């Protein structure tokens, strides 16, 4: 073994000893994540884009994409529940379903039935529920609306045409 190999092995051994020493006796401690996204960050970067994409998918009758975006929207709300336990003393996991679950079910039914009219109505109801949640939580200045255009110029929302 050359000097460099011995130094590397010695350094690795040193790190293992330090890590083992610092972890010993702390097995039951849960180490918090280094980064936890804030509520506004999740809403702006996850919920809102999928809310928009869900609408665009439905407008173009791209039902597979609409179902995918609905699932992504559900995941985004689950992230809110996971990372933000409470908001102004209210438990988010208990509060959100009252504003979302019914509308998610109605939208999913419209998507599976490929019913554009039902989809538009359900999407409008979901959007209204978003605003009702904001109002109930002293955030009435955040008003969500049905998108008038797509901010996603790099994504096609029309279904793929097959021959």
Identify the residue ranges that each predicted region occupies.
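The canonical Cys-X-X-Cys-His
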Residues: 126-137
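Solenoid-repeat scaffolds in large eukaryotic assemblies
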Residues: 65-66, 73, 119
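Short helix-adjacent coil turns
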Residues: 60-62, 111-118
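Bacterial N-terminal signal peptides that target proteins for export
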Residues: 1-10
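Short, solvent-exposed, charged loop/turn and helix-capping segments
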Residues: 76-95
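Immediate post-signal-peptide N-terminus of mature secreted/exported proteins
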Residues: 23-67, 157-163
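Bacterial N-terminal signal peptides
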Residues: 9-18
């Amino acid at each position: 073994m050359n000097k460099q190999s011995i130094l590397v092995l010695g350094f690795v051994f040193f790190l293992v000893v330090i890590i083992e020493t610092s972890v010993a006796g702390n097995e039951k401690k849960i180490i918090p994540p280094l980064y936890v996204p804030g509520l506004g960050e999740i809403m702006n970067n996850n919920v809102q884009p999928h809310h928009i994409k869900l609408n665009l998918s439905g407008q173009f009758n791209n039902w597979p994409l609409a179902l995918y975006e609905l699932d992504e929207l559900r995941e985004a709300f689950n992230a809110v529940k996971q990372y933000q336990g409470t908001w102004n003393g209210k438990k988010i996991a208990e509060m959100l379903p009252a504003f979302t679950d019914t509308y998610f079910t109605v939208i999913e039914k419209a998507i599976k039935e490929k019913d554009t009219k039902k989809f538009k109505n359900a999407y409008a109801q979901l959007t209204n529920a978003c605003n009702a949640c904001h109002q109930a939580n002293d955030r009435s200045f955040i008003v969500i609306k049905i998108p008038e255009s797509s901010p996603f110029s790099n994504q096609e929302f029309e279904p793929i045409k097959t021959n």
